[in-house]
């Protein structure tokens, strides 16, 4: 029966006014901290009164300019930039290993790791290099025998050290970026209205002196990413050009501006001895008069640039404002919970506070006191006396 009677109970809030300097100061201090947090961080910093659009739409067009000298040849954009379409990802070639006049046929591998003594060492279990292994061990030179392959001959020798194209440090990259936030139908580009043709021809990006110039010097990008140009050009690498659009659309249109930052994206591979840097191969194909095909194979080392666009926009909306305001007012009640814990467990007179805060009333009690007024009877029997706890009042009988 006790379980049943305990189940069918009802609890209601009882207000007790405690006149204590200690608990009063704690209560107001906690409330002040909560209000300061919501006003300073939630509303002013995080702008919780705004609805945000993070689905940024972006297009990037790039153009590289500059001339360099490599292997006694003057190189222009068509020679050292790939792909040529001017996309958000492109490579500036800084070093090349060239293998000319390759034709289909049979020839020995030229690397020391394919050294052999007999045909049994050139079986299919051996990892192929420049072509398909034929299973024969043939003479590479008068002192070296290597496994024979079928493929493009002669095979590539990529262990030679080649110079880098130092002029690439002064090449320029023009970036044209257009963005749109579809939720607000807001569009803008990195070519700001105050930029003229004259400005674009002579300006160079600098984070402080020219933060909105769309023309970037390659050497500056490498430096801003914390890299050394000579080392990066020799091994190759991947750099990120980040364009951030974080816009408060409650402000003027011209306050939404791009912010550029730079980083190396393949930092992990840089530290690896297995495959450091960035390189790739491509070939140029030709035909002789008799119809035979031959090619020039190029192993290119270069700096790959990834233009990464990110951002979000916010604008005032009544719904998030109401939700954040309700959360702020509700959170103020946390101070009451903390003060109750201190009041009922740590202050002097805690037992008296508990007796006044928690009171159990049963039907038997109500029937026994029906002939009297319990409120006045309780008040007459109550004597207030001041405790020694910072002006707190406890209630005694």
Swiss-Prot record:
Regulation (activators, inhibitors): Has high sensitivity to ATP. Fast activation by external ATP. Exhibits rapid desensitization. Sensitives to the ATP agonist:alpha/beta-methylene-ATP. Subject to allosteric inhibition by AF-219. Mg(2+) and Ca(2+) slow deactivation of P2RX3.
TM regions (residue ranges): 21-43, 323-341
GO biological process: behavioral response to formalin induced pain; behavioral response to pain; calcium ion transmembrane transport; cellular response to ATP; chemical synaptic transmission; establishment of localization in cell; inorganic cation transmembrane transport; modulation of chemical synaptic transmission
Extracellular side: 44-322
Annotated Mg(2+) binding sites: 111, 158
Keywords: ATP-binding, Calcium, Cell membrane, Disulfide bond, Glycoprotein, Ion channel, Ion transport, Ligand-gated ion channel, Magnesium, Membrane, Metal-binding, Nucleotide-binding, Receptor, Transmembrane, Transmembrane helix, Transport
Disulfide linkage: 107-153, 116-137, 122-147, 203-213, 247-256
Topological relation to the membrane, as annotated: Multi-pass membrane protein
Chief location bin: membrane
Tissue specificity of this protein: Selectively expressed in sensory ganglia.
Classification via InterPro entries: P2X3_purnocptor, P2X_extracellular_dom_sf, P2X_purnocptor, P2X_RECEPTOR_CS
A Pfam family that the UniProt record links to this protein: P2X_receptor
Residue ranges, Cytoplasmic side: 1-20, 342-397
Binding residues for Ca(2+): 158
PROSITE patterns per UniProt: P2X_RECEPTOR
Family to which the UniProt record says this protein belongs: Belongs to the P2X receptor family.
The protein's role, per its UniProt record: Extracellular ATP-activated non-selective cation channel. Plays particularly important role in sensory neurons where its activation is critical for gustatory, nociceptive responses, visceral reflexes and sensory hypersensitization.
Protein name as annotated: P2X purinoceptor 3
Taxonomy of the source species: Eukaryota, Metazoa, Chordata, Craniata, Vertebrata
């Amino acid at each position: 029966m006790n379980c049943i009677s305990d189940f069918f109970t009802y609890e209601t809030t009882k207000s007790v006014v405690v006149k204590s300097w200690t608990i009063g100061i704690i209560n107001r201090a906690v409330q002040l901290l909560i209000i300061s947090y919501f006003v300073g961080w939630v509303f002013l910093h995080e702008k919780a009164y705004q609805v945000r659009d993070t689905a940024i739409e972006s297009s990037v067009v790039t153009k590289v300019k500059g001339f360099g000298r490599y292997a006694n040849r003057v190189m222009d954009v068509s020679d050292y930039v790939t792909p040529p379409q001017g996309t958000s990802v492109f490579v500036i070639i800084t070093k090349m290993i060239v293998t000319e006049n390759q034709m289909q046929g049979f020839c020995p591998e030229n690397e020391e790791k394919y050294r052999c003594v007999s045909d049994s060492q050139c079986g299919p279990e051996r990892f192929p290099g420049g072509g398909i292994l034929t299973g024969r061990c043939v003479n590479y030179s008068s002192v070296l025998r290597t496994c024979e392959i079928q493929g493009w001959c002669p095979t590539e020798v990529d262990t030679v050290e080649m110079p880098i194209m130092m002029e690439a440090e002064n090449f320029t990259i023009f970036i044209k970026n257009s963005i749109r936030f579809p939720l607000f139908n807001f569009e803008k580009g990195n070519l700001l209205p105050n930029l003229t043709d004259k400005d674009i021809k002579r300006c160079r990006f600098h984070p402080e002196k020219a933060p909105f110039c769309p023309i970037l010097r390659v050497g500056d990008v490498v430096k801003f990413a914390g890299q050394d140009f000579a080392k990066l050009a020799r091994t190759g690498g991947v750099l990120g050009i980040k364009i951030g659009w974080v816009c408060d659309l409650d402000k003027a249109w011209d306050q939404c501006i791009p912010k550029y930052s730079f980083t190396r994206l393949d930092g992990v591979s840089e530290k690896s001895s297995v495959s450091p840097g960035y390189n790739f191969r491509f070939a140029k194909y030709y035909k002789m008069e008799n119809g035979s095909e031959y090619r020039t194979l190029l192993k290119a080392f270069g700096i790959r640039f990834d233009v990464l666009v990110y951002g979000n926009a916010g604008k005032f909306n009544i719904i998030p404002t109401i939700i954040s305001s309700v959360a702020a007012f509700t959170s103020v009640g946390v101070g009451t919970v903390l003060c109750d814990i201190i009041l009922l467990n740590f202050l002097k007179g805690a037992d008296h506070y508990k007796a006044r805060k928690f009171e159990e009333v049963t039907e038997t009690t109500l029937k026994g006191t029906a002939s009297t007024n319990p409120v006045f009877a309780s008040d007459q029997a109550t004597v207030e006396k001041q405790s020694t706890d910072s002006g707190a009042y406890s209630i005694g009988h």
